């Protein structure tokens, strides 16, 4: 009798476990269906990149970056041409974000040669979105973009209208990143510099961003660790080596 009770208990546990697994599988199927439905319904994101008159818009020759007296990036040679998507790749602390900021004109010490094409219009997405605050219309006006267009793009990135009534500081990390991405998509630029654009971004929005880049082929310089994303957009990689004097 004791054995039968034990076997019955084990059978009940196995049935319960099987039910949980089945429920999880069903949930995954429903989520996939919802994602596909969203993709079918969603309007495509649009971008209107500019083409610079120079074929090469960025060129670095034997470029080294410094934090104070410490060299953090070894001699680096690369260029970005019109219509190219280039990803800087390297370990944390190797100066990838600093390289982007140096190209943007920030006062970061360097040695070597860095050429930025004259008259180059750049649209920048920062790695850090935590500092964002205020209402979305105020943010748009401050950044010099059309509030209506910004909100239309955010709606395509799965924002509800109710979200626009809340201050940006109350948004999740992913929502804040979407605000920066949508702001960049509002801007006509020769070069789009995006620092870790996929941070906190959901799969649905990620697919839209990949398709956008595949369709419009904007000139881009990115920092992004996700290899699959790089492959999807056909990016060329530039390796940054960490060095210290």
Spell out what each predicted region is:
Residues 52-245:
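ABC ATP-binding cassette signature C-motif
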Residues 1-70, 81:
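Coupling and communication elements adjacent to P-loop NTPase active sites across diverse families
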